[in-house]
Amino acid sequence: VIAHLKGREKLLEHIGFPRQQGEWVTLVCLHSGLFTRDQLAFYLQGANRFYVRRCVKALLDCRVSSRLIADERVIDGRLICRIFGKQISEVLEIPHTRHRRETSLEVIRRRLLSLDFVLDHLELPWLPTEQEKVSCFEQLGIERDLLPRRIYAGRAKGLIHYFPLKTPVAVGPEAAVFVYVDPGMGTRTELDSWGEAHRRLWEKLRESGRRVEVVAVAWEQKLLDRAGRRLRSWVASEMSDNEKEALMLRQAIAETDFDTIESYGGFDAVVEMILRWDRKSPVPKDRGSIDSFRLWGSHRCRRIGDRLTK
């Protein structure tokens, strides 16, 4: 059972999808709208190509309300299957505009890489839809104004979409994971722009006691190396045990956590302890904007002939 699907896959049983195929279609509709046969084979735990071919054919032949819901074509040198049917989104009770429209090569690459990372980390508490992300952060007391967003002009003038790149976000009780996907077609400043759009959200999450981790995902080693050089400058300086304890005690005072305060000898003793540690460490540590980062290279989506470091 994949927890973040929230049982949506069961809604596909009545149109002929068995459990595992229903989970796959739901994953794709939530995270990317398209996939490669290599990704499907990985999800099916190394199934042979004939079984994968049958699964794809079943999807391509499937009709909902007498209409086809998927197609397959060669894009970017790969055979890519796209689920576009509005009807399947309605069955799954997710916004039908999420991933079904045809789009640019850059967005296609970003979506495939996003799905690939999620497939390797299905255990994380993913927030796959815009509404789930917004609701989660609002429940944590974080206002919408602090979330990354895009305000649209033209016919959709005034429409606001939060987390407009639709890259994966997972939030648990102790840590939050934000995935940055580099499709290899942008500029060197895009990572900085993405980070700036998330900065205030990350500040609030860290103030609440959650660690913030950024994962940079790409299909070329040079893109991972470039992201790594930049992300190192975002990470908070390592604190000593005393500094960590002082930070914990400051939070206890701010939150009027009397149990913790009393366990350290009362309010006066806690204040004196904090002041003593501050005198020993007069130079404040750089808190950075995130607590840690990882680099993740996609072997299933890598550029043909490009080697990725394990």
Can you say where each PLM-predicted feature lies in the sequence?
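Hydrophobic beta-strand segments of well-ordered beta-sheets in folded domains
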Residues: 168, 173-180, 206-219, 272, ...
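Exposed, interaction-prone assembly regions rather than primary DNA-binding/catalytic cores
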Residues: 101-193
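Non-catalytic C-terminal interaction segments of nucleic acid-processing enzymes
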Residues: 222-310
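Glycine-rich, often proline-containing surface loops adjacent to acidic residues and nearby aromatics
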Residues: 34-37, 89-100, 173-180, 211-213
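Catalytic cores of nucleic-acid endonucleases
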Residues: 181-239
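Short, amphipathic alpha-helical interaction segments positioned at domain boundaries
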Residues: 81-109
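Hydrophobic, Leu/Ile/Phe/Ala-enriched alpha-helical segments that form helix-helix packing faces
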Residues: 28, 44, 56-63, 117-125, ...
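Basic, Lys/Arg-rich alpha-helical nucleic-acid-recognition elements, primarily the DNA-binding modules
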Residues: 1-92
